[in-house]
């Protein structure tokens, strides 16, 4: 395709130049107005920013004063809470002591009633035992005298409710050699608290007397046990 085939365009350069000049003038005015607006906006922004900063300073100062008053109030409130806590603790401690004293009083009262009942029961039991002993002694006095005179039985009070029974006339080489045991009579059931020399089956004998309540038979069994132990010791020496 050749240039001859394109249409011919006639340009009015003077008119185009005038239009471009007008456009440039309009655009320059637009730029100046926009610069002026930007400058005004900037100045307004700086003014508002200054006002905001001033207001912020005033607000911060007011906040500091408020915080100071709040701190003073908080310290005062904490002090009151501490004093209240101390008072409540003192009241609680006093109440605990009072409750403990009341419980202790109740416990002591219950223990007192319990021991009164035990003492009353023991007195009644002791009276029954003394009556039974009195009746038994009326039958056994001759036998007891025989035990004391011929079998070498002696009785000694060790301390309250504990009696020592001493046997002699067991060792043929030394008739004065003592074989003894101590028995506690405080409770209804007897209890051997010391035995010399020790008998291996003493617990069985104690259980027997507690079951039968035959104390004289118990003395016979204990003396028999000492004799058997002595004979066993002699046989081991031979």
Curated annotation (Swiss-Prot):
Its main location: nucleus. It is found in: Nucleus; Chromosome, Centromere, Kinetochore. The lineage of its organism: Eukaryota, Fungi, Dikarya, Ascomycota, Taphrinomycotina. The gene is spc25. Acts as a component of the NMS (Ndc80-MIND-Spc7) super complex which has a role in kinetochore function during late meiotic prophase and throughout the mitotic cell cycle. Acts as a component of the essential kinetochore-associated NDC80 complex, which is required for chromosome segregation and spindle checkpoint activity. Component of the NDC80 complex, which consists of ndc80, nuf2, spc24 and spc25. Can self-associate. Component of the NMS super complex which consists of mis12, mis13, mis14, ndc80, nnf1, nuf2, sos7, spc7, spc24 and spc25. This is Kinetochore protein spc25. CDD domains: RWD_Spc25. It comes from Schizosaccharomyces pombe (strain 972 / ATCC 24843) (Fission yeast). GO terms for biological process: attachment of spindle microtubules to kinetochore; cell division; chromosome segregation; meiotic centromere clustering; mitotic sister chromatid segregation; spindle attachment to meiosis I kinetochore.
């Amino acid at each position: 395709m050749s240039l001859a085939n394109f249409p011919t365009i006639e340009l009015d350069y003077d008119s185009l130049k005038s239009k471009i000049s007008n456009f440039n003038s309009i655009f320059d005015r637009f730029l100046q107005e926009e610069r002026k607006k930007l400058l005004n906006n900037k100045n307004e922004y700086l003014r508002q920013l200054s006002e905001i900063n001033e207001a912020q300073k005033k607000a911060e100062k007011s906040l500091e004063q408020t915080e100071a008053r709040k701190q003073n109030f908080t310290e005062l409130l904490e002090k009151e809470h501490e004093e209240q806590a101390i008072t409540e603790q003192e009241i609680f401690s006093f109440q605990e002591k009072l409750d403990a004293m009341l419980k202790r009083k109740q416990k002591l009262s219950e223990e007192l009633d319990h021991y009164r009942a035990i003492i009353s029961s023991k007195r009644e039991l002791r009276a029954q035992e003394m009556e039974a002993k009195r009746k038994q002694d009326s039958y056994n006095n001759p036998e007891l005298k025989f035990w004391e005179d011929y079998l070498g039985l002696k009785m000694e009070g060790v301390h309250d409710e504990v009696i020592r029974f001493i046997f002699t006339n067991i060792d043929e080489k030394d008739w004065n050699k003592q074989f003894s045991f101590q028995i506690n009579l405080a409770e209804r059931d007897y209890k051997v608290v010391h035995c010399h020399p020790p008998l291996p089956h003493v617990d069985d004998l104690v259980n027997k007397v507690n079951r039968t309540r035959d104390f004289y038979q118990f003395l016979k069994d204990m003396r028999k046990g000492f004799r058997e132990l002595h004979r066993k010791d002699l046989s081991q020496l031979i």
